[in-house]
Amino acid sequence: MSMRIPQGELHTQLRAEAIETRERIAAIVRPLDLAQLNEHPEPNGWSVGQVLEHLCVADGRYEDPLTALMGRSRQDAGAPAREWKPSFIGGMIAGSLLKPKPLKSPKVFRPGPTPRNGVAEELLARELRFVKAMDDAALYDWKALRISSPALPSWAPKMNLGDGFRIHVVHLTRHSKQIERVAAKL
């Protein structure tokens, strides 16, 4: 994905990837029973359920700040045609998530030892809401609106809204590969 792109194109790309990734995750996790979701085939790795829980926790940390940002911001009909580019911090976060190298999850996003009941359907429902939120935000200026990362201290620079959407999709796609790998070992 180019680092400079019209916002409308970024929206289209992120939307397509989010939907495709959600469907891929659904196809993998829906056939799994509770024991399989909680099984740890990799001794030091997360179970499929913990990966799903991690994605739910991370999404939940962005939910209220995004709702508040959208509530206090104005729509801008010209925004989809304007160039979007990542902020410095947003580009760094997305870039690190795009690399295949294993990363430690920030403490604030770490799942507990046991995922919530119905974690698979919870994540799939959250992903439907994410696509709707992104669609609802299409007429806002993603480069101008700023949002904090819950993984960073409050004094850290804010990223732009497009970064938030991009990081969410890159993060989901990254973990879909982990889910696929772990589920294949069950």
Protein language model features and the residues they cover:
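Amphipathic alpha-helical coiled-coil segments and their boundaries
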Residues: 7, 11-14, 116, 161, ...
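A short, structured beta-strand-centered segment in the mid-to-C-terminal lobe
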Residues: 111-123
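Short, contiguous pre-domain boundary segments
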Residues: 2-3, 7, 105-114
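Short, contiguous alpha-helical
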Residues: 38-93, 128, 132-186
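Amphipathic alpha-helical coiled-coil segments
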Residues: 18-22, 123, 130
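Extreme N-terminal tail/first-helix region
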Residues: 1-19, 23
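A structural motif
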Residues: 93-107
